[in-house]
From Swiss-Prot:
Name of the protein in question: ATP-dependent Clp protease proteolytic subunit
Record's catalysed reaction(s): Hydrolysis of proteins to small peptides in the presence of ATP and magnesium. alpha-casein is the usual test substrate. In the absence of ATP, only oligopeptides shorter than five residues are hydrolyzed (such as succinyl-Leu-Tyr-|-NHMec, and Leu-Tyr-Leu-|-Tyr-Trp, in which cleavage of the -Tyr-|-Leu- and -Tyr-|-Trp bonds also occurs)
Quaternary data: Fourteen ClpP subunits assemble into 2 heptameric rings which stack back to back to give a disk-like structure with a central cavity, resembling the structure of eukaryotic proteasomes.
Species name: Listeria innocua serovar 6a (strain ATCC BAA-680 / CLIP 11262)
GO CC term (a single one): cytoplasm
Lineage: Bacteria, Bacillati, Bacillota, Bacilli, Bacillales
Keywords (A to Z) from UniProt: Cytoplasm, Hydrolase, Protease, Serine protease
Similarity field: Belongs to the peptidase S14 family.
Gene giving rise to this polypeptide: clpP
Record InterPro entries: ClpP, ClpP/crotonase-like_dom_sf, ClpP/TepA, ClpP_His_AS, ClpP_Ser_AS
Amino acid sequence: MNLIPTVIEQTSRGERAYDIYSRLLKDRIIMLGSAIDDNVANSIVSQLLFLDAQDPEKDIFLYINSPGGSISAGMAIYDTMNFVKADVQTIGMGMAASMGSFLLTAGANGKRFALPNAEIMIHQPLGGAQGQATEIEIAARHILKIKERMNTIMAEKTGQPYEVIARDTDRDNFMTAQEAKDYGLIDDIIVNKSGLKG
């Protein structure tokens, strides 16, 4: 059962009730707190586009606590983060794994953060195939192309050589916030909101 808290705000026109995510959106905060699938991606993309249309000069804050998920859904979020004019600050908390860590690293340069006890896990894309041998071969070639593209992006965002990224993502690679900072996945570790930019 997924309960969504409601907050009540006093306005000049009386009380107004919001679900917590709508209230956070007023402060330009987006929460990615689940596995990434098409529905989650569509929601995140819509919020990014809305906030950018509202004010492209103000930063957007994307908080990430996600085990990862669909590559295509995650890439829709990644592309939209780059598409919008507003800088997207990313804040990792809890666990940012797989596509979650990829999106954490995709934040605006100098504006990628993690909370002190966050864990970050990188690895290569996962995929499965069944069917005839030729279909399995096509799927394998496809996942290898995705792996190459994601490793290239990670190398650009972290400053690590491509070969290092390829080696380090060969298996599940868990990092503390400090290790992720040293690696270049994030820019800084913050303990409160005053550590955010802008």
